[in-house]
UniProtKB/Swiss-Prot annotation:
Belongs to the DegT/DnrJ/EryC1 family. L-glutamine:2-deoxy-scyllo-inosose/scyllo-inosose aminotransferase subfamily. This is L-glutamine:2-deoxy-scyllo-inosose aminotransferase. It comes from Streptomyces lividus. InterPro entries: DegT/StrS_aminotransferase (IPR000653), PyrdxlP-dep_Trfase (IPR015424), PyrdxlP-dep_Trfase_major (IPR015421), PyrdxlP-dep_Trfase_small (IPR015422). CDD domains: AHBA_syn. Catalyzes the PLP-dependent transamination of 2-deoxy-scyllo-inosose (2-DOI) to form 2-deoxy-scyllo-inosamine (2-DOIA) using L-glutamine as the amino donor. Also catalyzes the transamination of 3-amino-2,3-dideoxy-scyllo-inosose (keto-2-DOIA) into 2-deoxystreptamine (2-DOS).
Length: 424
């Protein structure tokens, strides 16, 4: 029984616990406690004579990314919607997005009454394929959103050139790529704007949260209006007890603000980010080599990537192996061997059960709009292949030791050797 699969009652490769995520920074508890007693828990709270935690984080994150402006927001989804609206995207416009991503890549476009146009991805990087984007541009296209997926950075040379050629804004969705860089420039700073998620699983997290970064002051001002009910931060210090937010009447918005608790936590977590990246990067490189020995194919990143980060470790099954059972069965077997979750890649958004515009009355904007937003009209063969063959592992596992990587490789090797025993 020692060599039989754990999912079938055999001994698991590993029974020791894995690193826990999130991992609070040294100053996190004190920072949150200071907010508790500060008398100001949100950006709309009364000014108390010192910069808000929201402003402190905004400055720190802008500096980290090498840009002039950062507008924190309530979530990654909110950040994407803010960026889209700040680009002028609205009713009936088309926005090109990758077909392989989290559902927010499509739902945020729907949320601004626009039409998501799903494009296929590069088979090596699993990021937006520039050739597919070129073929999808029409006179109705108003923006392109590129997602730096899993552990890869997209081909930004090709995508920025394409966007410039068609005079289209390019938004970088960096929810899975905090700190990555392309030709020496941080992701998010390469295009019109960059958006980030600070949700629980992310490499920089406050449980929930987000941010929009940009080099453009006018763009940042539009985002500020959109995320704070049409208000922006005052240009001068307010009096005690007054709000820092002022009403301008320039642009209507909604409340998508980050709380002071989240901002304080993010400022502290940011201090640990690069050190954690270094650990993940070293372990991912080791794991790449170990898994290649068994025929697995790790996800690649684009040639221009100068700093790689690893949100999700993604690896493709060896060619022609384990094809007799679904990927979910393989993932369950690996999870049983390791005592942590190994998951199949995202399904293409076009057939993700969580993405169903027809289930929401707010998107019933006429026969033509409903036809255009029907996800079944798109064919995404590369994304479909990834959903059949790519396995993923959360970055927390990469914060372990070298022996942990060897355990992962041993589990992948064991499941491959005993794959014939698996049944769907």
């Amino acid at each position: 029984m020692a060599q039989s699969l754990a999912v079938q009652g055999g001994s698991a490769v590993r029974t020791r616990p894995w690193p826990v995520w999130p991992r609070p920074a040294a100053g996190a508890a004190e920072a949150v406690q200071q907010v508790l007693s500060s008398g100001r828990w949100s950006i709309s709270g009364p000014y108390r004579g010192a910069a808000s935690q929201e402003r402190r984080f905004a400055r720190a994150f802008a500096e980290y990314n090498g840009v002039a402006h950062c507008v924190p927001a309530a979530s990654g989804t909110a950040s994407l919607m803010l960026a889209l609206e700040a680009c002028g995207v609205g009713a009936g416009d088309e926005v090109i997005v990758p077909g392989l991503s989290w559902v927010a890549s499509g739902s945020t476009v729907l949320g601004v009454n626009a039409v998501p146009v799903f494009c296929d991805v590069d088979p090596r990087t699993l990021c937006l394929d520039p050739e597919a984007v070129e073929a999808a541009v029409t006179e109705r296209t108003k923006a392109i959103v590129v997602v730096h997926l899993y552990s890869a950075v997209a081909d930004m040379d090709a995508l920025t050139a394409l966007a410039e050629r068609h005079s289209l804004p390019l938004i970088e969705d960096c929810a899975q790529a905090h700190g990555a860089a392309y030709r020496g420039v941080k992701v998010g700073a390469l295009a019109t704007a960059g958006t980030f998620s600070m949700q629980h699983s992310k490499m920089l997290t406050s449980g929930e949260g987000g941010a929009v970064i940009t080099r453009d002051a006018d763009f940042a001002r539009r985002v500020e209006h959109l995320r704070a009910d049409g208000r922006v931060l005052a240009g001068q210090r307010p009096g005690p007890g007054e709000m820092e937010l002022v009403e301008t009447g320039e642009l209507m918005g909604n409340n998508r603000c980050l709380s002071e608790f989240q901002a304080a936590l993010l400022t502290e977590q940011l201090k640990d980010l690069d050190a954690q990246h270094a650990i993940r990067r070293r372990n991912a490189a080791l794991l790449d080599g170990l898994l290649r020995e068994s025929g697995y194919v790790p996800q690649e990143t684009s040639e221009g990537t100068s700093t790689r980060t690893h949100y999700t470790y993604a690896v493709r099954l060896p060619e022609g192996r384990l094809t007799h059972v679904g990927l979910a069965t393989v993932a369950r077997a690996l999870s049983a061997e390791l005592g942590c979750t190994v998951a199949p890649s995202y399904a293409p958004i076009t057939r993700n059960r969580l993405y169903d515009p027809a289930s929401r009355r707010r998107f019933a904007l006429g026969v033509e709009h409903q036809a255009l937003t029907d996800p079944k009209r798109f064919e995404l063969p590369v994304a479909e292949d990834a959903a059949r063959r790519v396995l993923t592992l959360h970055h927390a596992a990469l914060l372990g030791a070298e022996d942990d990587m060897r355990d992962i490789a041993a589990a992948f090797g064991k499941v491959l050797r005993h794959g014939a025993d698996l049944t769907a």
